[in-house]
Amino acid sequence: MTSRFGHSQHPRRGRSARARAGRREGVQSNFPATQVLERSAHSLPARQRTALVMAGGTGGHIFPGLALAEALRERGWQVHWLGTPGSMEERLVPPRGFAFEPIDFSGVRGKGLKTLLALPLRLARACLQARAVVRRLQPDVVIGLGGYVTFPGGIAARLARKPLLLHEQNSVPGMANKLLSRLATRVYTAFPNVLPDAQWVGNPMRRAFTRQPRPERRLAGREGPLRLLVVGGSLGAKALNDIVPQALAWIHEQDRPIVTHQSGESQIEALRRSYAAAGVEATLTPFIEDTAAAFAEADLVLCRAGASTVTEIAAVGAAAVFVPFPHAVDDHQTTNAQYLVKVGGGWLVQQADLTAHGLAEMLQNMKRQDLLAKAQKARTMRKINATRDIVAACERLAR
């Protein structure tokens, strides 16, 4: 029997029909429909988020980018890297398991009038190539860390309305980051007061730098010759390679520091000849696998003043003599070094003032207690949460 609306007037028979229908669909009849939908939604796998990292040209841009890329991957992100063919980033990034997206663009400073005149066409082509990468990947965030490749990638990101995060490693901003900072969603810096409306977070770096024991624990009870670490970087520092062996030769053998000297692959043979000619023994290496441990082991570091080097020395808490690269753009290495030197966290010696005799005298006059004080002051300037803060911002923007 049915009502005038055509529904069954026998409730038990009606519920049985619904139950049979539910079983046919694989759904228990005693669950409300909303609960079934919620349970189905929660069982779906979460969409994998994608980040496009842009950094190139030098290790100072690339290694902070790799620290961020690895942290994002640990959080389940898929990370792609925008770079240029035949570059340092193309050599370093793919072996670490990140997809490399090449576009054709390079620097213009010091390349002559012909290169400068061709810039508009080259930039337009690079922007189109970057735009194609962004369209294909549809990244949740785009992260620029400097180098010329960042500029066309940043333009492409904003045209596609993708969140653009910038990080400037140096105390003097590079051209690409300076131009893009007005368009970016978030801007971060490794040093204070670098770009307007930027958040000072420090430099992204591997956890090994932030987990070394404090200087007073590392240096407690040390005796004997000082342990000197000379760091020339990936390309080496010819001035250090030439002067340091001569300086050590001025010091009596019993008083000489125990030296580890890193020079870069291209200069290792010349460095061996320099030490042999000076009659000085040292551990010579083209590359240091664990830089954090090497900084922690040294009583004194003699090095250039790239942004990564300065901020990593601060993170570990190590005494350092900084010799800025004199041809760095806008002399930014001098400004980088002053961040620690101005608080008593190191020494600054311009390359033009660096002599073998002067360096020998400086090393002979150094005492461990003085080096410990420098290391402690350097450590007070460390900012170690950049990776955490930038990754957290990426996750907020990707929701």
Swiss-Prot record:
Gene Ontology CC annotations of this record: plasma membrane
InterPro entries noted in UniProt: GlcNAc_MurG (IPR006009), Glyco_trans_28_C (IPR007235), GlycoTrans_28_N (IPR004276)
Statement: the UniProt record of this protein carries the keyword Acetylation: no
Pathway: Cell wall biogenesis; peptidoglycan biosynthesis
Main subcellular location: membrane
Pfam families: Glyco_tran_28_C, Glyco_transf_28
Basic residues composition-biased segments: 7-21
Compartments (UniProt record): Cell inner membrane
Membrane topology annotation: Peripheral membrane protein
SUPFAM superfamilies (UniProt xref): UDP-Glycosyltransferase/glycogen phosphorylase
EC number: 2.4.1.227
Alphabetized GO MF terms: UDP-N-acetyl-D-glucosamine:N-acetylmuramoyl-L-alanyl-D-glutamyl-meso-2,6-diaminopimelyl-D-alanyl-D-alanine-diphosphoundecaprenol 4-beta-N-acetylglucosaminlytransferase activity; undecaprenyldiphospho-muramoylpentapeptide beta-N-acetylglucosaminyltransferase activity
Binding site residues for UDP-N-acetyl-alpha-D-glucosamine: 58-60, 170, 206, 234, 288, 333
Segments for region (Disordered): 1-31
Keywords: Cell cycle, Cell division, Cell inner membrane, Cell membrane, Cell shape, Cell wall biogenesis/degradation, Glycosyltransferase, Membrane, Peptidoglycan synthesis, Transferase
Cystine residue pairs: none
Enzyme class label: transferase
Catalysed reaction equations from the record: di-trans,octa-cis-undecaprenyl diphospho-N-acetyl-alpha-D-muramoyl-L-alanyl-D-glutamyl-meso-2,6-diaminopimeloyl-D-alanyl-D-alanine + UDP-N-acetyl-alpha-D-glucosamine = di-trans,octa-cis-undecaprenyl diphospho-[N-acetyl-alpha-D-glucosaminyl-(1->4)]-N-acetyl-alpha-D-muramoyl-L-alanyl-D-glutamyl-meso-2,6-diaminopimeloyl-D-alanyl-D-alanine + UDP + H(+)
One GO term of the biological process aspect: lipid glycosylation
PANTHER family: GLYCOSYLTRANSFERASE, UDP-N-ACETYLGLUCOSAMINE--N-ACETYLMURAMYL-(PENTAPEPTIDE) PYROPHOSPHORYL-UNDECAPRENOL N-ACETYLGLUCOSAMINE TRANSFERASE 1
Family per similarity comment: Belongs to the glycosyltransferase 28 family. MurG subfamily.
Role according to the record: Cell wall formation. Catalyzes the transfer of a GlcNAc subunit on undecaprenyl-pyrophosphoryl-MurNAc-pentapeptide (lipid intermediate I) to form undecaprenyl-pyrophosphoryl-MurNAc-(pentapeptide)GlcNAc (lipid intermediate II).
Protein name: UDP-N-acetylglucosamine--N-acetylmuramyl-(pentapeptide) pyrophosphoryl-undecaprenol N-acetylglucosamine transferase
Protein species of origin: Acidovorax sp. (strain JS42)
Gene: murG
